[in-house]
């Protein structure tokens, strides 16, 4: 089972952006392999990015859109040229400020690239924020 949370840091940053009139831009997904991650427990909304040694991949947001007046979606596609790594933690950030907006704790997943005649896998990840 996966767990999802919008961080308190994002809520504060979003309010700050509103005050200054600057856009709220979430532009990068971060994939990590966090040892001992318990996906059955709720996420602490104060959680930060994992240490650099646990981050296995970063990928730009490829699509975003408004679902309704209270929800937006951000998506990325990890193509067959990306890999090999395993991940159980995904975050959505504003790259310029390094603000972590949303977190998913998930069961361990593999991302394999195409090599030596073996077809890799293609993964799409989408985060819906309400």
Explain the meaning of each model-derived region.
Residues 1-130:
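N-terminal assembly/attachment segments of tailed bacteriophage virion structural proteins
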């Amino acid at each position: 089972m996966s767990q999802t949370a919008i961080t308190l840091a994002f809520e504060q940053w979003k309010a700050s952006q509103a005050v200054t009139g600057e856009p709220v831009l979430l532009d990068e997904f971060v994939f990590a392999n966090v040892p001992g991650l318990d996906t059955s427990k709720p996420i602490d909304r104060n959680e930060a990015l994992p240490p650099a040694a646990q981050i296995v991949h970063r990928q730009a947001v490829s699509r975003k859109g408004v679902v309704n007046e209270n929800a937006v979606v951000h998506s990325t596609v990890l193509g067959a040229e990306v890999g090999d790594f395993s991940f159980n933690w995904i975050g959505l950030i504003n790259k310029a400020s390094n603000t972590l907006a949303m977190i998913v704790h998930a069961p361990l997943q593999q991302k394999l690239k195409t090599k030596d005649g073996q077809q890799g896998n293609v993964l799409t990840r989408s985060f819906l924020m309400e």
